[in-house]
Amino acid sequence: MADKVIALACAAGMSTSLLVSKMQKAAAENGKDYEIFAKSTADIDNMLAGTGSPKPDVLLLGPQVAFMKGEVAKKAEIAGVPMDVIKMQDYGMMRGDKVLAAAENLMN
């Protein structure tokens, strides 16, 4: 079982798949055992409940769904899961190491 679980949510759960791969690579290079996955924003309630996937230790929203931050933040707070929106620059440039660092900062 992974030490930490990092969930990403975007419009369809597809556009973040490359970013997830880059984050997994960065984690492995640093000896971190993280489970990192992406799903659609429609799955946020299930993710926060740990239904169908492990409950995340942190939830990151893709910048294209940043408008949902207020609503998701309330749900995440109730679930005890820190969350934030991925920086547009890091998302656009697929900087897995930077997004991983942001997730780690939220978990600490």
UniProtKB/Swiss-Prot annotation:
Signal peptide: none
Superkingdom, taxonomy of origin: Bacteria
UniProt domain PTS EIIB type-3: residue ranges: 3-108
Catalytic activity: N(pros)-phospho-L-histidyl-[protein] + D-galactose(out) = D-galactose 6-phosphate(in) + L-histidyl-[protein]
Keywords: Kinase, Phosphoprotein, Phosphotransferase system, Sugar transport, Transferase, Transport
Recorded GO MF terms: kinase activity; protein-N(PI)-phosphohistidine-sugar phosphotransferase activity
InterPro entries, per the entry: PTS_EIIB-like_sf, PTS_EIIB_2/3, PTS_EIIB_3, PTS_sugar-specific_EIIB
EC number: 2.7.1.204
Active-site residues annotated for this sequence: C10 (phosphocysteine intermediate)
Enzyme class name: transferase
Phosphocysteine: residues bearing it: C10
Record's note on what induces expression: Induced by growth on galactose.
Pfam family, one: PTS_IIB
Gene Ontology biological-process annotations: phosphoenolpyruvate-dependent sugar phosphotransferase system
Function: The phosphoenolpyruvate-dependent sugar phosphotransferase system (sugar PTS), a major carbohydrate active transport system, catalyzes the phosphorylation of incoming sugar substrates concomitantly with their translocation across the cell membrane. Involved in galactose transport with PtcA and Lmg_0963.
Notes concerning its domains: The PTS EIIB type-3 domain is phosphorylated by phospho-EIIA on a cysteinyl residue. Then, it transfers the phosphoryl group to the sugar substrate concomitantly with the sugar uptake processed by the PTS EIIC type-3 domain.
Protein name per UniProt: PTS system galactose-specific EIIB component
Annotated source species: Lactococcus lactis subsp. cremoris (strain MG1363)
